[in-house]
Amino acid sequence: YDESVLTYTERSTVVTLSVTARGVQMKQAEREATAEEKAAAANPLLDSGRQYLIRVDQAAALLREIGILTADGKLKNDMIRKYNQIDHYVELVAPMFEQDDSDEIVLLDCACGKSYLSFVMNYYIHEVLHRRCRVIGVDIKEHVIDESRAMAKRLGYHNMTFICADLRTYQPPKNVTAVISLHACDIATDLALGTATRA
């Protein structure tokens, strides 16, 4: 053979490897959005003047898995507020991660609940910034931890860990880059802050 070419798609990136007698070349490009994904991104209920960091046309698999999109790729009306909330959160913390020069970003999501923020931050850091990251979600409710583990498995996110633990006694790892929490009920906000001081 004169040349072998392997092309594969990993979430939002198309990777092409070319092997010749001269060596190996690798090219990466953003995956072209499908017509279905483009239609979902053009939803008139979204803020058309806003530049979304978690774009519906690029993150459709993730947004479908966490329940923001329908099976056919349309933004659910009752999830538009949640989508705006998590995207705005990413917008607020993005500069911190864009400037981080560590080998690996480690996020700890306290009182992670359904893990919307864990999954979206993982997507943003890994797929948009192309950085190595590890995400740890902690919640006291076993059923939400089980579901988060199942979603991570379905998405192929092997860098995510979900732990069922009480934040009052949970001992976080020492190499945490940032502690995050979307919102917490009752005293969970206080517990998340307490956990952050121990990380």
Regions found by a protein language model. Name each.
Residues 133-139:
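Conserved SAM-binding motif I beta-strand of class I
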Residues 186-198:
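A short, conserved alpha-helix within the catalytic core of class I
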Residues 114-130:
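Conserved SAM-binding loop of SAM-dependent methyltransferases across substrates and taxa
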Residues 9-105:
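Conserved Class I S-adenosyl-L-methionine-dependent methyltransferase catalytic core
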Residues 103-113:
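Conserved class I S-adenosyl-L-methionine
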Residues 176-182:
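Short SAM/SAH-binding signature in class I
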Residues 143-176:
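S-adenosyl-L-methionine
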